């Protein structure tokens, strides 16, 4: 499970991959993938970093752990592979996007178009056992993803951090650079969306901020396939 990034994350993370905690994560995962069903496929664990280079990040949307159903997770937070039913949280994200910016609700949940525009779709835990939510939350992934958030915080160019739900909001402590813009609300899950996610307008707020610093806005419309 050696990782090779064909972008600037390679240099930024090479020392992290040599640390003792990460070697333990890797050893644990080798055994987990050998003996259990683990999501996403091991080739997709780092998709968020493969698709969105450090220098290109303009927005971060933090998720918790990958979807734990068959064929869903592919390494981008909230996104599912084409041809898979759209999960309830993403349905609510699409509903808010429709209300906020007038985007139509597409027929799939594959969000790579966002990643290609500089939206880092990062889960705080990068793997999960099939059918067992949060099952890999304590194996060391959070040390790794906290480090990524700190690297992003260190960047000179401003970034929008979108934090949905308590797990994501707990990472606000790493975002200390005042030039970054933080948008936070309850999680888009059906359990909480009506308590402050709907109507929070995160997408238009993001674009307004990007335009205010002379950046191109994100085209949030995911087209039908």
Swiss-Prot record:
Pfam families: UDG. One of its GO terms (biological process) is base-excision repair, AP site formation via deaminated base removal. It is found in: Cytoplasm. Its main location: cytoplasm. Excises uracil residues from the DNA which can arise as a result of misincorporation of dUMP residues by DNA polymerase or due to deamination of cytosine. HAMAP family: UDG (MF_00148). This is Uracil-DNA glycosylase. It comes from Alkaliphilus oremlandii (strain OhILAs). The lineage of its organism: Bacteria, Bacillati, Bacillota, Clostridia, Peptostreptococcales.
